[in-house]
């Protein structure tokens, strides 16, 4: 039995942060990339991975412990659809279906609230950062050629 694998499947996250007026809440964001590693086209098991978005915030001096509502939304990527995002093979037209989810049960698509997706909102305080996990899944049974596949997702953080 010959096994073909895909290596270096990467999703690149682009972070957009919004500047706020002086004296407003100050937040910092760190995003780790999501890499699926090798994908076995003969496996009956989906390929899963995860990434983390960490948001830390400081409130203004007059109320340093104030909770700050933070919202995180993700773009649909190059496919333009939350129903099924797609990784494209570098140098070729081949596509590999995948999606990003809010929970490890892979039941809720993480997006911007449109097209059946949901954004995520949480309260962040000076002492309590938000470590939001993005759960990625490539469904099994996709017959694609070996190569590097990627997509670009824009992560939008609002506070």
Region roles according to the model:
Residues 8-19:
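Bacterial N-terminal signal peptides
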Residues 88-113:
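Extracellular/luminal beta-rich ligand-recognition
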Residues 1-7:
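Positively charged n-region of N-terminal signal peptides that target proteins for export
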Residues 22-92, 120-159:
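N-terminal small/polar-rich segments of proteins
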Residues 13, 112-119, 133:
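Short, highly charged low-complexity linear segments
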Residues 27-31, 108-117:
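Short beta-strand and strand-turn-strand segments in soluble, beta-rich domains
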């Amino acid at each position: 039995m010959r096994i073909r694998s895909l290596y270096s499947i990467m999703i690149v996250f682009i972070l957009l942060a919004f500047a706020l007026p002086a004296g407003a809440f100050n937040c910092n964001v760190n995003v780790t990339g999501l890499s699926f590693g090798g994908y076995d086209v003969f496996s009956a098991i989906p390929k899963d991975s995860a990434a983390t978005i960490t948001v830390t915030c400081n409130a203004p001096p007059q109320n340093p412990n104030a909770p700050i509502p933070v919202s995180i939304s993700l773009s649909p990527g190059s496919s333009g659809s939350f129903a099924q995002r797609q990784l494209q093979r570098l140098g070729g037209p081949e596509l590999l279906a995948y999606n990003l989810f809010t929970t490890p049960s892979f039941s809720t698509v993480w997006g911007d609230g449109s097209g059946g997706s949901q954004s995520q909102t949480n309260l962040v305080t000076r002492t309590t950062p938000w470590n939001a996990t993005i759960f990625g899944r490539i469904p099994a049974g996709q017959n694609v050629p070996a190569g590097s596949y990627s997509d670009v997702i824009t992560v939008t953080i609002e506070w």
